[in-house]
C-alpha cells in the first residue's frame, strides 16, 4: 500500500486533507507539531481526529515556541477579521517551511511517497507559505536535497485543497465523512470559538455558502 505523511493541525483544512489521503487509498502517517500555539485545543482535536479514523500512528513533534506571532505570543492580540491584503500578525515565521522540512525527513524514514498538506490560496489569511509558488519551490528543494529525490523518486507534496473555496473544502470533507465537529479553528483558543477572528469568519462563511450547519460552539456567529 502507498504511504503518505499527512500534516494534521486539528483544524478543518488539515482534517479534510487527511480524509482525502485516506479516500485515495494511502496508508497515512499523521504528523502534528507543538510549536507553542495559543490554541492548545488544536493538538487535542488532532488526537481525536486520529482516533475517529482509527489510525495507529500519530507523531507529535514538540519544537518549542516559535514566537513572533499572535498565534504563539500571548502579548500580541489576535485581531478581528478585516480582510486586508496584507500578511497578518497571525503569520507564524516560516511555519510551513519548518513543518514540511520535518515531514520530508519523516517520509523518507517511513518510506512514504507523498506528503499531504492542507494549504489553501483562495479563502485564506494571506500567508506567503500557503501559495502555490511556495509549494513548487519546496518541491524543487526536495528533488535536489534528498536521497529519494536524487534517486529519481522524490517525495511528492500533494495539496488537494489549494484551489478550493472554503465551501468546497467543507463539502469535500462531508463527502469523505470527515469529523468536522471535532476540529478546532479559532485563533484565540478559548473554550468556545470566538467567531470573529480570520479563521472563524472564513469557516462560518464556508459553512453558510455550503449550506451545511457548523455544529461547533461559537461565542458569536457573524
From Swiss-Prot:
SUPFAM superfamilies: Adenine nucleotide alpha hydrolases-like. It comes from the Bacteria. Belongs to the QueC family. Disulfide bonds: none annotated. Gene3D superfamilies: HUPs. Zn(2+) binds at residues 186, 194, 197, 200. Keywords: ATP-binding, Ligase, Metal-binding, Nucleotide-binding, Queuosine biosynthesis, Zinc. Its EC number is 6.3.4.20. Catalyzes the ATP-dependent conversion of 7-carboxy-7-deazaguanine (CDG) to 7-cyano-7-deazaguanine (preQ(0)). Pfam families: QueC (PF06508). This is 7-cyano-7-deazaguanine synthase. It is an enzyme of class 6 (ligase). InterPro entries: QueC, Rossmann-like_a/b/a_fold. It catalyses: 7-carboxy-7-deazaguanine + NH4(+) + ATP = 7-cyano-7-deazaguanine + ADP + phosphate + H2O + H(+). ATP binds at residues 8-18.
